[in-house]
Amino acid sequence: MKVLVSVFNNLYTDQRVEKVCRTLSEAGYDIELIGNNWGGLPEMQRPYPFSRISLKSKSLKLAYPEFNWKLYQELLKKADKNTILLSNDLDTLLANYLVSKKLSIPLVFDSHEIFTEMPAINGRFTQKIWRILEKFIVPKLKFMMTASESYADWFAKTYGIERPTVVQNFPVKIENPQNYSEINLKKVILYQGVINPSRGLNKMIPAMEKIENAEFWICGDGPKKEAYLALTKTLGLQEKVKFLGKLLPKNLRDITKKADVGLSIEENNGLSYFYSMPNKVSDYIQARVPVVVSNFPEMGKVIDRFQVGEKINSHNELAEKVNIVLERGKIFYEYALNKAATELCWEKEEPKILALFRKVTQKHF
């Protein structure tokens, strides 16, 4: 059975799509992945064929329609009656939906987030366009999965649909990588991810004034990097706040396990953030690093269930909660982190994907 997977990115850093493709490929599905050249064409290898559609548009508002038109043509060329379409996020859905209807083949929609509630489009005209598209297609879908329990509840309630299958974007399980005899002379507080607004970084940098004998490492790049570098300099915190830039996945894993606490301190700037389970939380947990997180539904549930760190209800609590975790130390959380790592891993999510695709196959072939 052929599965044509499409996503609006250059494929290189999309871990969810890579894991889903690998899971399906290892289960015997014939996978082909289609992305684009938005963000460059980094070299990569995969055990299944992939291609990247060339986009001429320089702005996203033009790139989205260009991609969907070219994707529509590409899918028509590659699909046959023994094909399942797998559309990732709303920005690939129109092309997939039209091909699905034209060829009478099944479509699975994987919504990694609530696209229409992303902070980047909040209050903009483009948000209205995406909402119209979402409202038109999502209620017609028979097979859908999404990345958090709260997302699934939102889609079911908003569109009156059967609750989507929840496939959390957890990392592959790793054995405890910690060497507890290695102790940082200065404690390491870690943030990994894009340096965007609403990630709480502009609150954490000043909070470092109240945290002694520690450094704040920011791993990633993004539109707010220069502003946060300037803030660090203005506060005279260059010795306590380090910008490590965008790292290769292996280097990031090596740095993550050195951390004494990992942060996921998003601000409530839209439902997509509020209902998310950020990848970095489970990445920290697999590295056996305790966490400080915003008390949003999904992250809060992890702390309540596994006791792997602290929650903040306000960014005013940052220094206090980070200091609690640092004073307790990593060994204090070892048992809880090992238990959480066994549950919050990709191996627990794979059966849900395979069950969904078995359902698609049984109903259509």
Across the structure, where does each feature detected by a protein language model lie?
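Nucleotide-sugar donor phosphate/pyrophosphate-binding loop at the beta->alpha transition
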Residues: 65-69, 103-106, 115-136, 173-175, ...
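Donor nucleotide-sugar binding/catalytic pocket of nucleotide-sugar-dependent glycosyltransferases
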Residues: 35, 131-178, 242
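Nucleotide-activated donor-binding/catalytic signature segment of Leloir-type glycosyltransferases, i.e.
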Residues: 226-254
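Membrane-proximal helix-turn-helix segments that form the acceptor-binding/catalytic region
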Residues: 69-76, 94, 98-102, 109, ...
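A charged, aromatic-enriched C-terminal amphipathic alpha-helix characteristic of glycosyltransferases
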Residues: 316, 327-361
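Nucleotide-sugar-dependent
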Residues: 11-14, 199, 250-254, 262-282, ...
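Conserved donor-binding/catalytic core segment of Leloir-type glycosyltransferases
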Residues: 5-6, 145, 182-208, 217, ...
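Conserved acidic donor-binding segment of nucleotide-sugar-dependent glycosyltransferases
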Residues: 305-316, 323-330
